[in-house]
From Swiss-Prot:
It is found in: Cytoplasm. Zn(2+) binds at C28, C209, H234, E238. The gene is cysS. PANTHER family: CYSTEINE--TRNA LIGASE, CYTOPLASMIC, CYSTEINYL-TRNA SYNTHETASE. A motif ('KMSKS' region) lies at residues 266-270. Its EC number is 6.1.1.16. Its cofactor is Zn(2+). This is Cysteine--tRNA ligase. ATP binds at K269.
Length: 454
């Protein structure tokens, strides 16, 4: 039975979907004005893993992950680039999809763009105004009145007074309370704008997700996820908007993945330790990056460093080494002891570190000649989107530390075999040592010599 740590209650709870056998899940996606970074990679991979596990558990999952394609940052970047916001966002949506494919992330069932749902946002804002939970300000912005929603702060675990004291909120004469947040922004010259009952303008960020999730999943659904940085204010504000407008529970289970840190420091452009997915993939195979993300529990901080990625590469290499000659993945026999342990780990709040430990147990058995263990390793890896390549393809991918590609390595192996045939063992050993220094491991067997990268 699956148990999930619910950020709303701060406890681990048994997962019971609203409709038996069906799960509806919404995850906050990208604001598309730049290339995706490591924090985005973690969101992509974590909720891909969650979706895969729910489906492996027999649920029909409807997974929605939105795209924010209108935002202050988008408008600013488009102006700097002398292009339209639409052209900018279209380009970075394509780049995002390329990154996801590289990381083995399955596409969501729905990927709504905010600009396609402005009518729904306007209807939701009108409901909030009618209920006395929102007001038009003198500057033609529309704000949510947090005083009107007594449960505000429930997700954060803080009262409104505590939130006011803890947040550095600029005094705005248009707001009735410093914590009030914008639902509709009045139009500014040169910015995209839509007609509304309050004049031309565009939606605020928070209302976008409330409107899109209600339109695609209904007013009350099972799981809402995203990065820990969105818990406040974004997700807190979503609850206030959605429950304030609809008068019912918004979401049953809130899931938040932990922060990504770089060498134990917060990742930021100002510190010069900010990495895009593209930059990381220039140094490391994409499956290594996915494996690195899944080795950590999704709620824990993830500390990025070259040393940790190198360690992940070595660990994944050990798993693939055990898969030499293994056939493609097939159905999992969940009654098998290893598979049952894997299920137990995943059902315990998606505990991927424990699940991956089971994979290493299977690899050890496979290395002792247990072909059934190798097949189970392959099958269980598939459940979380790992270990599906031909083992030799993974083990020989890329270039060596000395810059050797596969054809150059094969040529040196052929030269070594010629030296051995001529009984020139000194030359044979020299070539082996040279390749070892370049990070290439040779394995001599009855069928000849095979190789892999360390």
């Amino acid at each position: 039975m699956l148990h999930i740590t619910n950020s709303l209650t701060r406890t681990k709870e048994e997962f019971v979907p609203l409709s038996p056998g069906r799960v509806r899940m919404y995850v906050c996606g990208m604001t598309v004005y730049d290339l995706c970074h490591l924090g985005h990679a973690r969101v992509f991979v974590v909720f891909d893993m969650v979706t895969r596990w729910l489906r492996a558990s027999g649920y029909a999952v409807e997974y929605v992950r939105n795209i924010t394609d209108i935002d202050d940052k988008i408008i600013k970047r488009a102006h700097e680039n002398k292009e339209t916001p639409a052209a900018l966002t279209e380009r970075f949506i394509a780049e995002m999809h390329e990154d996801e494919r590289a990381l083995g992330v399955l596409p969501p069932d729905h990927e709504p763009r905010a600009t396609a749902y402005v009518a729904q946002m306007l209807a939701l804002i009108a409901q909030l105004v009618d209920r006395g939970l929102a007001y038009a300000a003198p500057n033609a912005d529309v704000y949510y009145s947090v005083r009107g929603f007594p449960a505000y702060g429930r997700l954060s675990g803080k009262s409104l007074d505590e939130l006011r004291a803890g947040e550095r909120v600029e005094v705005d004469p248009n707001k009735r309370d410093p914590m009030d947040f914008v639902l509709w922004k009045a139009a500014k010259p040169g910015e995209p704008a839509w007609e509304s009952p309050w004049g031309q303008g565009r939606p605020g960020w928070h209302i976008e997700c409330s409107a899109m999730s209600a339109e695609l999943l209904g007013q009350h659904f099972d799981i809402h996820g995203g990065g820990q940085d969105l818990q406040f204010p974004h997700h807190e504000n979503e609850i206030a908007q959605s429950e304030g407008a609809h008068g019912c529970t918004f979401v049953n289970y809130w899931l938040h993945n932990g922060f990504v840190r770089v060498d134990n420091e917060k990742m930021s452009k100002s510190l010069g330790n900010f990495f895009t997915i593209r930059e990381v993939l220039q140094k490391y195979d994409a499956e290594i990056v996915r494996f690195f993300i899944l080795r950590a529990h999704y709620r824990s901080p993830l500390n990025y460093s070259d040393a940790h990625l190198d360690d992940a590469r070595g660990a994944l290499t050990r798993l693939y080494t055990a898969l030499k000659g293994a056939p493609a993945a097939g159905p999992v026999d969940w009654d098998a002891p290893a598979a049952a342990r894997f299920r137990g780990a995943m059902d315990d709040d998606f505990n991927t570190p424990e699940a991956i430990a089971v994979l290493f147990e299977l690899a050890a058995e496979a290395n002792r000649g247990d072909t059934g263990a190798a097949q189970t390793l392959r099958n269980l890896g598939a459940v979380i989107g790992l270990l599906q390549r031909d083992a030799s393809d993974f083990l020989q991918a890329g270039t060596s530390e000395a810059g050797l590609d596969a054809s150059e390595i094969e040529a040196r192996i052929a030269a070594r075999q010629a030296a051995r045939k001529a009984r020139d063992f000194a030359e044979s050993d020299r070539i082996r040592d040279e390749l070892a220094a370049a990070g290439i491991v040779l394995e001599d067997g009855p069928g000849g010599t095979t190789w892999r990268r360390q």
